[in-house]
C-alpha cells in the first residue's frame, strides 16, 4: 500500500471513530498496554517528568498527556492524524491549544528541534506509514539525553489466534506487510504494521538512537480492555505471551 492511501485510510478511520462516539479498545497512560500487571505508576519509566517538556505522537484526545501534566510535566505538545481528536485535545488543554497539531507522525512539522525531554508513542507507532521518518524527526525534536518511549503490540502476539478453544500460531512473525484491521463496534477500517523487534531496534539505531531499556511485561487475565471487549485482545493469548512490548530509546 502506498503512503498516501495508508495515511488517508487512517485519517478517515480515526475521525469516524471519534464522530461515532462509540467505545473501542484504547490504551492511555498510566497503562502501557492491555492486561499488563504494572503501569507507569509502578514502572516509573519517566522518572524525571517534573518540569519536563513532552511530545506525544498519536496523542488522541490528550489523555496520556493529561496524566503526565498532572504528574508535573511543564509543557505538552501533541501530534495526531485525526482533526477530531485534536479538537478534543485542545478543549482538554486550552492553555496549550497551539501545541496540538493535525499531522501524521512520519511528516515533519513546525515544532522546536532539540527541545523535548520525552517523546511518547503509546500504542500508535504501528499506524505510521514510514517508521524511518518517524524516528528521523523524533530524533530532531528530542533534546540531547532525552528519551523516546514506544509501546505497541508485542509482534509475536500478532501471530496468535484462537481456534477450537486453543491458542494457535496463524501468522508469520516475519510478515511485516501493512494490513487492514477494523476497530470498534462499527468495524471502522484502519491500516497498521506489524514490526519485528529487530526492525524497530535497527531503524532506531540508524537514526542515532540507542536502546536504554526494553520491557516485556507479564499480564493479568482479563476479558476486556478498559471496559471494551475485543476479539483481538484475548486473555487466553496472554497466558504465555506478552501483549505489549515497550522500547525506551535515548538520544546521545
Question: Locations of the language-model features?
Answer:
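A short glycine-rich, Lys/Arg-flanked "PGG" loop and its adjoining helix->strand segment in the class I
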Residues: 132-147
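Core SAM-dependent methyltransferase catalytic element
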Residues: 207-209, 230-252
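Acceptor-substrate binding/catalytic loop of class I
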Residues: 152, 156, 184-199
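Short alpha-helix
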Residues: 191-214
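Class I SAM-dependent methyltransferase SAM/SAH-binding core
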Residues: 55-57, 61-108
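A short acidic, Gly/Pro-enriched loop at the edge of an enzyme's catalytic core
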Residues: 110-119
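Conserved class I S-adenosyl-L-methionine
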Residues: 1-50, 63-67, 148-179
Amino acid at each position: 500500500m502506498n503512503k498516501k492511501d495508508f495515511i488517508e485510510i487512517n485519517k478517515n478511520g480515526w475521525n469516524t471513530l471519534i464522530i461515532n462516539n462509540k467505545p473501542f479498545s484504547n490504551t492511555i497512560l498510566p497503562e502501557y498496554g492491555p492486561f499488563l500487571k504494572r503501569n507507569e505508576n509502578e514502572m516509573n519509566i519517566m522518572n524525571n517528568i517534573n518540569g519536563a517538556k513532552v511530545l506525544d505522537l498519536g496523542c488522541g484526545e490528550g489523555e496520556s498527556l493529561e496524566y503526565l501534566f498532572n504528574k508535573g510535566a511543564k509543557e505538552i505538545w501533541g501530534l495526531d492524524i485525526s482533526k477530531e481528536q485534536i479538537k478534543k485535545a485542545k478543549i482538554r488543554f486550552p492553555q496549550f491549544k497551539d501545541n496540538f497539531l493535525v499531522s501524521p507522525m512520519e511528516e515533519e512539522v513546525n515544532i522546536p528541534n532539540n527541545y523535548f525531554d520525552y517523546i511518547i508513542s503509546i500504542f500508535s507507532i504501528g499506524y505510521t506509514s514510514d517508521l524511518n521518518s518517524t524516528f528521523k524527526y523524533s530524533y530532531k525534536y528530542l533534546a540531547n539525553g532525552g528519551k523516546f518511549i514506544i509501546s505497541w503490540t508485542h509482534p509475536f502476539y500478532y501471530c496468535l489466534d484462537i481456534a477450537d478453544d486453543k491458542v494457535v500460531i496463524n501468522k508469520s512473525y516475519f510478515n511485516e506487510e501493512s494490513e487492514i484491521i477494523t476497530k470498534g463496534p462499527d468495524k471502522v477500517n484502519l491500516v497498521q504494521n506489524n514490526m519485528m523487534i529487530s526492525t524497530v531496534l535497527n531503524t532506531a539505531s540508524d537514526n542515532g538512537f540507542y536502546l536504554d531499556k526494553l520491557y516485556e511485561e507479564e499480564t493479568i487475565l482479563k476479558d476486556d480492555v478498559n471496559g471494551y471487549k475485543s476479539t483481538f485482545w484475548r486473555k487466553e493469548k496472554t497466558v504465555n505471551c506478552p501483549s505489549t512490548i515497550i522500547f525506551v530509546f535515548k538520544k546521545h
